[in-house]
């Protein structure tokens, strides 16, 4: 696989070419994903739940993400590698810059932060200092205590309109990717069509430019709850490599997510 950059994703958006992405946490799986030409990987703070056994992502630290970012980069030298900025690691723009630098030094090409237009100054400061940003909207797991649980976001018209405004503001501030989680497909389609930058969805229908799954959900090995929008591709194929290939193929064709894995 050739080296993937944000320019490739922008080109694919313009061409209408959909792309698959996945979380990854170690060199072995990163190498497997690269062998199947997975273009984008995310070292997610989901590692707190799927690796560390926590009930949410809040205990994850910058050092945790940096460690796993180094591991993934060694296994996949050519992917576009995103790294989550954990809870309270970007409370101020200055703090965000300091912590983002640690993740870039660990091998990340881009950092992902959760939140709306209150992050505009942070996104501007990061991009001005050569740190690309993915803005995460919708269900932002670090806000679980504010939301009162993991709930679909953007069903009410005023909240949907607010999410559109947030997406535009973050793009204007310099965000190069927007990730939408657990939002109605119609809203995700609207945001995808309005934005110039690529939009990646999870639980947001198949109208986004890309899709992402937590790798443990893709293989059906999550310890507890399996979200409605996830699919066990290993059960369908019986082989890990074939499962990854099938996921990539189904995203590219628009077969995944289908209605059974879409939030209305």
Curated annotation (Swiss-Prot):
The cross-references to SUPFAM superfamilies, in alphabetical order and at most eight, read: Phosphoenolpyruvate/pyruvate domain (SSF51621)
- Pfam name, any one: Pantoate_transf
Pathway(s) where this gene product acts: Cofactor biosynthesis; (R)-pantothenate biosynthesis; (R)-pantoate from 3-methyl-2-oxobutanoate: step 1/2
Q: Name one GO molecular function term.
A: 3-methyl-2-oxobutanoate hydroxymethyltransferase activity
Q: Which cofactor does it need?
A: Mg(2+)
Q: Where does 3-methyl-2-oxobutanoate bind?
A: 45-46, 84, 112
The record's InterPro entries line, in alphabetical order, gives: Pantoate_hydroxy_MeTrfase, Pyrv/PenolPyrv_kinase-like_dom, Pyrv_kinase-like_dom_sf
Task: Give the UniProt entry's GO cellular component terms.
Answer: cytoplasm
EC number(s) recorded for this UniProt protein: 2.1.2.11
Report keywords, A-Z.
Answer: Cytoplasm, Magnesium, Metal-binding, Pantothenate biosynthesis, Transferase
Give the cofactor binding note. Binds 1 Mg(2+) ion per subunit.
Transmembrane regions listed in the UniProt entry: none
Q: State the superkingdom.
A: Bacteria
Question: Which amino acid positions bind Mg(2+), per UniProt?
Answer: 45, 84, 114
Function of the protein: Catalyzes the reversible reaction in which hydroxymethyl group from 5,10-methylenetetrahydrofolate is transferred onto alpha-ketoisovalerate to form ketopantoate.
HAMAP family with a match to the protein in the record: PanB
Known partners and oligomeric status: Homodecamer; pentamer of dimers.
From the Swiss-Prot or TrEMBL record, give the protein name.
3-methyl-2-oxobutanoate hydroxymethyltransferase
